[in-house]
């Protein structure tokens, strides 16, 4: 993989990435308006720059849509006061870890000896997701979950627990999520009204 960063006068920093094993040029607009152009390995970076130029209108449409969605969302903000922030982090660590273990045991995310499948639970303050699960069974939860309503916290935790069995979002994952959280589609929509940025 080779990467080149260019600065576009309107779009800002653009990452051009040449990768092996891909056949088409593609553009991804990510969190905080990051833009990545993926280029097949045998193509020059100039091909990516041309593709970017041809796609400017589409990118601007996507950015406007993202801005509109962000404006409609309620941001979940952490306090700027260090003492209050420390207190929230302390409470969150205990409460989210305890609730994750409770839900794991309640819904059968356990080994044959009855212990939870979870490797470890870590709290992070990231801007891209509410939670994640690794192939080793480690669950990372966004500290801001602690500031959400309890039913949304449980939804995110259950979503990550389902990844202990299925590390993708395929049909089996969705069947399992449906079985442990029948209202997951409604809860996902409700969660999307909140922003972690």
Task: Describe the role of every protein-language-model region.
Residues 160:
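Walker B catalytic acidic pair
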Residues 1-155, 164-197:
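Active-site-proximal or metal-binding-adjacent scaffold patches in catalytic folds
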């Amino acid at each position: 993989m080779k990467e080149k960063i260019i600065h576009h006068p309107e779009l800002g920093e653009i990452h051009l990435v040449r990768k092996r094993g891909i056949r088409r040029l593609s553009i991804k607009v990510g969190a905080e308006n990051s833009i990545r152009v993926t280029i097949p390995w045998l193509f020059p970076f100039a091909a990516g720059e041309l593709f970017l130029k041809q796609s400017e209108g589409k990118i601007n449409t996507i950015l406007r849509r993202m801005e509109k969605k962000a404006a409609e969302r309620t941001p979940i903000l952490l306090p700027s006061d260090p003492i209050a922030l420390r207190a929230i982090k302390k409470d969150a660590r205990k409460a989210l870890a305890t609730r994750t273990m409770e839900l794991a045991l309640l819904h059968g995310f356990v080994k044959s000896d009855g212990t939870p499948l979870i490797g470890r639970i870590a709290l992070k303050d990231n801007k891209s997701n509410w939670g994640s699960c690794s192939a080793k069974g480690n669950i990372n939860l966004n500290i801001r979950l602690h500031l959400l309503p309890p039913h949304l916290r449980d939804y995110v935790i259950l979503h990550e627990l389902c990844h202990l069995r299925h590390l993708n979002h395929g049909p089996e994952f969705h069947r399992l999520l449906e079985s442990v959280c029948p209202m997951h589609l409604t809860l996902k929509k409700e969660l999307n009204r909140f922003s972690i940025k």
